[in-house]
Design a protein with these regions (language model features):
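The feature marks the mature, well-folded catalytic cores of soluble enzymes
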Residues: 1-182
Length: 182
């Protein structure tokens, strides 16, 4: 039997980049990673063998520790909390995916231009949480499924928004997004 591996098999470039940043940082000693870099236990176990310690919350990270932020992006409050632990500048390696950063920049520009921004994503996913922060609203409307399109329309009509933009968490389905906006 012949097995062919897809040309684009493996991690997306944002996750690959985050793993590379964590591994490179850990060459200089103990490194904390805030959150999961990747949803793959084998890879996490391999990284733990390389001076990398994963922290699910900031309280687990000691003051003055070298820290890497995951690819999903973080709300500004994360940076503020880390700064309070003297974790900034050369002690902080931000591995946010460039595509996620691009979404954050687009969202800021849309909000500054008077748009109500709706997120197509998972409410509890770090990327949607971080994007929501950049919209500057705890009441950011997040729709998780294209089947919830009626709730989006209801939200728009109820609030009488003049300009609306719907953006997507980068890991959501393109087909789902198209279904939602149509």
């Amino acid at each position: 039997m012949k097995i062919t591996v897809a040309k684009h098999a493996g991690f997306c470039f944002g996750v690959k980049r985050a793993i590379d940043i964590a591994e490179h940082t850990a060459l200089n000693g103990k490194t904390y990673v805030y959150g999961q870099l990747v949803h793959n236990e084998r890879v996490i176990d391999d990284l733990k063998k390389k001076n990398i310690i994963f922290a699910d919350n900031i309280e687990e990270i000691p003051k003055n520790s070298v820290t890497v932020l995951r690819a999903h992006g973080e709300p500004g409050t994360t940076y503020e909390e880390l700064k309070g632990k003297n974790i900034e500048n050369e002690k902080l390696n931000d591995a946010t995916c460039p595509l996620v950063t691009l979404v954050h920049n687009v969202v800021i520009k849309l909000k500054n231009n008077g748009y109500e921004v709706i997120i197509f994503g998972k409410r509890d996913h770090p990327e949607s949480i971080g994007t929501s922060y950049h919209i500057k609203g705890k009441d950011t409307f997040i729709v998780e499924s294209p089947d919830d399109a009626s709730s989006v329309i209801e939200h728009i009509n109820k609030n009488k928004f003049e300009k609306v933009a719907i953006i997507s968490q980068t890991t959501m389905s393109v087909d789902g997004y198209k279904k939602l906006i149509n």
